[in-house]
Amino acid sequence: MDWDQLELHPRIIAAVRRDLQRLTGLSRSDVQQLLTAAATTCRRHPPTPALLLQRGECGGFKSDLRLSVGCPVLDELLRGGLPAGGITEVSGESGAGKTQLALQLCLSAQYPTEYRGLNSGAVYICTEDSFPNRRLQQLIREQSSLRTDVPPSLISSLQFSDHIYIEHAADLVVLYLQDSLQVCLSRRVPLLLARGLVRLLVVDSVAALFRAEFQAADWLERSKQLITFSSTLHHLSQEFTTPVLCINQVTDVFSSSDDSLGPLSSSVSPALGLVWANQVMVRLMMRRLQGTVARGNQSSALRRLEVVFAPHLARDGRDAAVWREGVRGVQT
C-alpha cells in the first residue's frame, strides 16, 4: 500500500510532506519512503465486512480453524470454539472460572486439528498473580477424563507442560517504560509463532495492565496505551491466524439503563470501557451463580458462560461447573 492510496485531500498530503522535510531535514525521496512505510503500518490488513464474518467466509472463521474448549456443551455455544483470528475476551468476577477456562484452552490447543486443537503450544502472559502451575498439572493428569473423544494413547504422548510458555508482567510502568511487554509481544511471541511452537496467546488479565497506574484524569493516555496494546494483539492474530484470549475483570454497574455491551443479566460490566470494547471481536462473560451441583464425590458452584457480543454468535449462555478435570457445561 502507498501513502497516496489513503483517503486524504491532496493538499493535506502535500503539506505533510513539506512539514516532514522541514522538521527532519530528510530528502524528498526519503520522506516518500517514510510515508509509504507509515501508510503500510497503519493499514496492514483490509477491513473485514460483517457479512463475511457471519457467513464464515473469512480466515479466522473457517470451520476448520476453531479452538475447542474441550466440552461439547460449551463448544455448541461458541459454534465450535474460539475463532482463530481476532481478540476473544472472557470477563467475570473473581472465582468465576476465567483462569480455569484459559488453562483448559492452553491444553486444548495442543491437540491435533482433527480433535479441534491447533497442534501447537500456547503463550500465557500473567499480569497479576503467579501462574497457577499446580492447577495446570491437575488438569493435565485429568485430561483423559475431560477429553473422552481423544484416544488415551494420544493424550499420554503429549508433553503438555513443555509447550506452555509463561511470561510474567507486573504493571504498566514496567511494561511500557522499560519495554518488558513490548519486547515480549514484538520479539519473543512473534518468534514462537513464526517457528510454529505456539498458536494461542493468553493475557491474564488485561485490566491489571491499565487500571492500577492511571488516575481518572489520565483517561486519554490510558486510551492511547490500550489502542497500542490491542493493535499489537490484532497484528499477531492476523499475521499468524492465531486466537488471542484476554481475561478481563469487571466493575459494578450503578445505572439501571440497558447496556448492550454488558452481559445478559448482571450487575457488573467488563472493565476498561468502550475503548477496549471496540477492540474486542468476541466478548464472553463468566458468572458465578447461586447454588451448587454435585457429581459423585465432587461438588462445584454453578457458573454460567454467556456470549455478550460476537459477529457470528447469538446472545446466549450455558450453565457450567468446574471439576477436577476442568470446566464442563451442565446439561439442563
What function would you assign to each model-found segment?
Residues T88, V123-I125, Y165-E167, L245, ...:
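Hydrophobic/aromatic beta-strand patches that form the interior of the parallel beta-sheet core
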Residues G117-L220:
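Conserved inter-motif catalytic segment of the P-loop NTP-binding fold
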Residues C71, A84, T99-Q100, N133, ...:
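Amphipathic alpha-helical transducer elements in NTP-driven molecular machines
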Residues W3-V16, L175:
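Short, intrinsically disordered, charge-balanced linker/junction segments flanking boundaries
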Residues G95, D129-S130, D171-V173, A207-A208, ...:
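Conserved beta-strand elements of beta-rich interaction domains across eukaryotes
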Residues A37, T41-R44, G80-G81, E93, ...:
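Conserved, well-folded catalytic cores of nucleic-acid-processing
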Residues K224-I227, S231, H235-T332:
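Phosphate-binding/switch region of NTP-binding enzymes
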Residues P10-R11, A15, D19-T24, D30-P151, ...:
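The Walker A/P-loop phosphate-binding site
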